[in-house]
Amino acid sequence: MKLTILHKIVNRVIRKCQSVLGVCTLGSRAIVLNPQNQVLLVKHTYQPHWYIPGGGVKKRESAKAAVLRELKEEVGLSVIGEPELFSIYHHTYLGVSDYPIIYIVKNYSLTNVSSPEIEKMGWFDYGNLPEMTSPGTMRRLNEYFTNCPKSDT
């Protein structure tokens, strides 16, 4: 619990500095589906919600390279072939523009991995997602599973 509070404080300070400097952030995430059409979600040690896996794009790294790296680091997943681009979004959080890029991944191999960032991971049916699924994750999954129009945010 202390880590979550500390993370929130540090995150707010970083976001305030980014806002003052006019920095934008770029993220890369994946909707990973198994053969039963279940989606992979992760719960971080420092966040209360469940998310589709992914993270920030590093300097001189492509969004695709970032999602491949994050999937390997967070859940031990190696993508076979190419991830499919789903959409690019924009939202503002604490005054900072963030651009998450979402991919679809259906072909992969999994190895056992332990990440200090990940508290839990699991496969879920779209109709039976965890109660604490993040609002952004819910929007992305609704767009994917119901074919509703994709939003900008």
Task: Enumerate the language-model features and the residues they cover.
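Acidic, metal-coordinating catalytic segment for phosphate/diphosphate chemistry
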Residues: M1-R29
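Conserved hydrophobic/aromatic beta-strand scaffold that supports enzyme active sites
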Residues: I31, L41, I102-I104, W123
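Active-site-adjacent beta-strand/loop module that shapes the phosphate/pyrophosphate-binding cleft
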Residues: Y89-N112, C148
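Conserved Nudix-box catalytic region and its N-terminal flanking loop in Nudix hydrolases
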Residues: N34, Q38-E74
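A short coil-to-beta-strand element that immediately follows conserved catalytic motifs
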Residues: S78-S87
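NUDIX/MutT-family hydrolases
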Residues: I104, V113-F145
